[in-house]
Amino acid sequence: MADISSLNAFFNPASVAVIGASSDPSKAGHTALQNLLSMGYRGKVYPVNPREESILGLRCYRSLLDIPEPVELCVLLVAAGLTLRVAGEIAERKRRHGDVAAAVCMSAGFGELNTPEAKE
């Protein structure tokens, strides 16, 4: 059985990639990024969005695979239809760099749609 230190990546990560970060204040990707920056998080923060150059003063990366420094926690704030692709990027990053220790998926549009595709 794992000990409590295995949860450090969730509760005290050295770095966080916010996948689906947004410059639009009405989007969850903006709120999550803003909260990390305004509530005293001291680690490195990497916004990820292929359509943005920078968000809230931080350089934005097109993909998780483009971040040149270690990433410990990934926070997914993408549409349900993109989640599997992003999960594949996380697996590929872990294979290449061995650095992603945890991920949190806060995407909407799965089972609550009550469609076979969403439930899959």
Identify the function of each model-found stretch:
Residues 1-120:
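Catalytic-core regions of core metabolic enzymes
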